[in-house]
Design a protein with these regions (language model features):
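Conserved N-terminal phosphate-binding loop of PLP-dependent enzymes in the Aspartate aminotransferase
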Residues: 1-406
C-alpha cells in the first residue's frame, strides 16, 4: 500500500483542477457542467463574488477560542433563528453536517433521558458513529459497534409505516425521530403532508422529539428556505450545513427549541474547536443576508426553472420506466434499477455532465440560480446519454467523423 495518500472508500470519479460558475474542470482540462454542486453545497455556483468577496476581504481575528465570545456568532445565530421554523430559538456551533447531527442526537438524549432513536431505513445523517447509527442498516452490518437502540422505518411512507412508528413510540423510550423532511438520499422522497402531520402528533403524544435534518435541503434547495415549511413541520431540533457558506468555508449548526437548548446548555458537551470559524461566519452572514434580501425573486425564478426541468424530464425518452420527482431544484429520476442508474451517471459524466447516482435514483442538483440556457444544455446531455444504444453509437460515430474531418 502506497504511503502518503488520501484514504478513499472507492476510486474517485474525477480529479478536479478548478471550478467556476456552473462548471468544473478536471486535471486534463476537460470541462463539466455541474449538476451536482458538491451535493447541495454550491447553491449559487462556484466562485460567486457574493461569497468570494467577504472571504478575501476578511479583517477579523484568525481564530476565536470557543470559551470566549465573538459578536458575529450572535449575529449569525440571530439571523439563522429569524428564518428558521418555530419553535427553534438557540444555535449550537458545528463544523459541518455530521457534527450538527451528533449534537442533535446528544441534545435529544439529554433532554428526554431516553436512549433510543427512530429514523428512516436507507437514510443518511452523517459519518460519525451517531450519524451512521441512525442511517442505513447496512452501516450496522459493516460496523458492529454502532450505538444500540437505533431502529428504522422502511419506506414507502404510508399507513404501514405510520403504524410502525406508532408501535415504536408507544414504548415511550424513543428520544427522537430524525428524518430529512424531503429525503435527498432516498431520491427526493417527498412524504404526504398527512403523513408528516401524524408523525408530529405521535411524537408530541409520546414526548419524542422531532429532529429535522436540513443539512442538504436547507437554504432554498427544495423551493422554500427550508423543506420544513412545505410540510408544516415544527421541529424541536433542526440541523443545517452545506449551502450555508456556498462551499467557501466549513460550517454547520444545530438549532433547538428553548427547552431543549436549556437542557443541552446545562448538561451537554458541545465544545467545537473549529465550529463557526470567524472567516466562515463572515461568509455565512453574507450568504444568508443575500438570501433574505432576495428570497421572493430567487424562489420565483427557481419555481420557473423547476417547472422547466419537470416538463423536459417527464417527456424525455429513457431506456427504463422513470418516476420523476421534483421539488425546487432537488430533482430525482427513479428508474427502479440501480445498475442502469449507475451506468447512466457514467454516460453523463463521459459527455461532460456531473450528476449523482443514489441507488436506483439519478439526482440532478444544479445551482439555484442556474439560467435556462445552462439548464437546457445539461438536459440535452442527459437526453443524449439516456437515448437508445443504437442512437448513441450513431451520434458517437458522427462526432468522431466530424472531428477527423476537421
Amino acid at each position: 500500500m502506497a504511503r502518503g495518500r488520501v484514504a478513499r472508500e472507492e476510486e474517485p470519479e474525477l480529479r478536479v483542477q478548478r471550478s467556476e460558475g456552473h462548471y468544473v474542470w478536471d486535471t486534463r482540462g476537460k470541462k463539466y457542467l455541474d449538476f451536482l454542486m458538491g451535493w447541495c453545497v454550491g447553491n449559487f455556483g462556484w466562485g460567486n463574488a457574493l461569497m468570494e468577496k467577504p472571504a478575501r476581504a476578511f479583517k477579523g481575528p484568525d481564530y476565536v477560542y470557543p470559551g470566549f465570545d465573538y459578536p458575529p456568532w450572535d449575529e449569525l445565530a440571530e439571523l439563522l433563528v429569524s428564518i428558521a421554523p418555530e419553535p427553534l430559538a438557540v444555535c449550537f456551533r458545528a463544523t459541518g453536517g455530521s457534527e450538527a447531527v451528533d449534537l442533535a442526537l446528544q441534545a435529544a438524549l439529554i433532554h428526554t433521558g431516553r436512549r433510543k432513536f427512530l429514523s428512516l431505513e436507507d437514510s443518511y445523517h452523517g459519518n460519525t458513529l451517531a450519524g451512521l447509527s441512525v442511517g442505513a442498516s447496512e452501516n450496522r452490518e459493516k460496523r458492529k459497534n454502532l450505538l444500540p437502540g437505533c431502529r428504522k422505518v422502511k419506506p414507502p411512507l404510508d399507513e404501514k409505516a405510520l403504524a410502525r412508528i406508532e408501535r415504536e413510540l408507544a414504548g415511550k423510550d424513543v428520544a427522537a425521530f430524525i428524518m430529512e423532511p424531503i429525503s435527498m438520499n432516498l431520491g427526493v422522497l417527498v412524504p404526504e403532508a398527512g403523513f408528516i402531520a401524524e408523525v408530529q402528533r405521535l411524537c408530541r403524544k409520546h414526548r419524542t422529539l422531532f429532529i429535522a435534518d436540513e443539512v442538504a435541503t436547507g437554504f432554498g434547495r427544495t423551493g422554500t428556505l427550508f423543506a420544513c415549511e412545505q410540510l408544516g413541520i415544527a421541529p424541536d431540533i433542526m440541523t443545517v450545513a452545506k449551502a450555508i457558506t456556498d462551499g467557501v468555508g466549513g460550517m454547520g449548526a444545530m438549532l433547538a427549541s428553548a427547552p431543549v437548548a436549556r437542557s443541552m446548555e446545562k448538561h451537554g458537551v458541545f465544545y467545537s474547536t473549529y465550529g463557526w470559524h470567524p472567516r466562515s461566519v463572515d461568509i455565512a452572514l453574507a450568504t444568508l443576508r443575500f438570501l433574505v434580501k432576495n428570497e421572493k425573486r430567487l424562489l420565483e425564478d427557481m419555481a420557473a426553472t423547476s417547472d422547466y426541468f419537470r416538463s423536459r424530464l417527464q417527456s424525455m425518452a429513457f431506456g427504463k420506466t422513470a418516476e420523476v420527482r421534483v421539488r425546487g431544484l432537488a430533482i430525482g429520476i427513479d428508474f427502479r434499477d440501480e445498475k442502469y442508474t449507475s451506468k447512466l451517471a457514467d454516460r453523463c459524466r463521459e459527455r461532460g455532465l456531473l450528476t449523482s447516482a443514489e441507488g436506483e435514483t439519478l439526482l440532478l442538483i444544479p445551482a439555484l440560480d442556474v439560467d435556462r440556457d445552462t439548464a437546457r444544455k445539461g438536459l440535452d446531455i442527459l437526453a443524449d446519454a439516456a437515448g437508445p444504444p443504437a442512437a448513441r453509437a450513431s451520434r458517437k460515430s458522427r462526432a468522431a467523423a466530424s472531428s477527423k474531418a476537421s
